[in-house]
């Protein structure tokens, strides 16, 4: 994500920024832009840094930059992170010091986690970045199962639709290493060209079960090689609806490729809206807090809330003073 504009200077500044915030209790992603723009906030954070290399970056490098070069250096970060944080939905999620959703707990207890990453709601880049962050979090929490005995690890199934939108190195790690931690990955996408080359190689090099429905001729050439001699490119191109070719991995050995029929979408089935509403309501009560509360906390943390509160107090004092003057005037008139 942002690979086309990701340079060594951007990475250097962003890395030291994040390492600095990690040493500050209660820090969030909102601190990335603030530490680069708010000098008082930056001094407060730097004073608590214990890592000499990170501290040296701010004292001996960043603070000694000329303003012109400093603006040039931080502008790409402010642009990219600012775009991400400008969405109220995302800002309210990543602007909280502690998440109310524990993915490791969900994995160990067999909970269901559904994430809506609709591009229409949060934008394409934001959807990709947030999705990549969540998938990486699943990967890290799966790897943390190293402190569990293998027999105690429960299978957890991660389903990712249109996974090319979130394709990062995490996929390669999950496919090659996370299976021993019982994180099972199911991915779906429309055509191979959507995947970066390294991700494509990791997918076809590590995936156990491969299912293909009707594809274009370019994809058919590649996928038919994965299925072996039994399936030719025209077979994949000419498939009808609700049919597929499938290859399984059984006892670490690939099965013979076979064709299968799938079920079409059920007709006339209406979703139970009342039950859906109940599930959402219970989930909100158990795992979330009111949006207004979160936004007020973020406002106060940013310093804007304090200014607004101070302005309100000033107005209140001025109003009270006017009332006192008016009251005194009335008394004089009565006399």
Predicted regions and their residues:
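Conserved P-loop NTPase motor module
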Residues: 33, 40-49, 72-76, 105, ...
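Short, surface-exposed, polar/charged, turn-prone segments marking secondary-structure boundaries
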Residues: 141-145, 185-188, 213-216, 238-241, ...
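P-loop NTPase motor domains
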Residues: 1-183, 199, 236, 240, ...
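Conserved residues at beta->alpha junctions
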Residues: 162, 190, 214, 263-264
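Conserved ATP-driven motor cores of ASCE-family P-loop NTPases powering translocation/secretion/packaging/pilus
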Residues: 174-256
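Hydrophobic residues at beta-strand termini and immediately following loops
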Residues: 115, 213, 260
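Short amphipathic C-terminal alpha-helix that caps PH/PH-like domains
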Residues: 130-138, 223, 227, 264
């Amino acid at each position: 994500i942002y690979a086309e504009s990701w340079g060594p200077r951007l990475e250097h500044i962003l890395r030291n920024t994040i390492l600095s915030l990690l040493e500050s209790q209660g820090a969030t992603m909102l601190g990335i832009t603030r530490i680069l723009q708010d000098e008082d906030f930056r001094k407060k954070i730097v004073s608590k840094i214990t890592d000499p290399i990170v501290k040296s970056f701010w004292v001996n490098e960043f603070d000694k930059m000329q303003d012109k070069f400093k603006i040039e250096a931080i502008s790409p970060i402010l642009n990219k992170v600012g775009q991400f944080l400008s969405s109220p939905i995302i800002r309210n999620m990543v602007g909280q010091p502690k998440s109310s959703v524990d993915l490791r707990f969900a994995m160990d207890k067999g909970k269901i986690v559904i994430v809506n990453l609709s591009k229409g709601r949060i934008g394409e880049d934001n959807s990709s970045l947030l999705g990549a962050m969540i998938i990486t979090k699943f990967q890290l929490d799966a790897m943390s199962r190293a402190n569990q005995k293998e027999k105690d690890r429960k299978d957890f199934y991660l389903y990712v639709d249109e996974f090319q939108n979130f394709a990062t190195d995490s996929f390669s790690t999950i496919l090659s290493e996370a299976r021993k931690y019982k994180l099972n990955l199911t991915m779906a996408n429309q055509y191979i060209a959507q995947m970066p080359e390294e991700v494509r190689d990791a997918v076809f090099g590590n995936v156990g079960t491969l299912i293909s429905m009707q594809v274009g001729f370019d994809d058919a050439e590649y996928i038919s090689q994965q299925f072996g001699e039994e399936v030719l490119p025209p077979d994949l191109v000419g498939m009808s609806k609700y049919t597929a070719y499938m290859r399984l991995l059984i006892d670490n050995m690939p099965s013979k490729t076979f064709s299968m029929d799938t079920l079409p979408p059920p007709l006339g089935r209406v979703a139970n809206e009342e039950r859906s509403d109940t599930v959402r309501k219970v989930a909100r009560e158990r795992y979330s807090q009111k949006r207004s509360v979160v936004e007020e906390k973020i406002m106060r943390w940013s310093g804007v809330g304090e200014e607004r509160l101070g302005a309100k107090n000033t107005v209140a004092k001025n109003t009270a003073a006017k009332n006192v003057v008016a009251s005194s005037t009335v008394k004089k008139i009565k006399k």
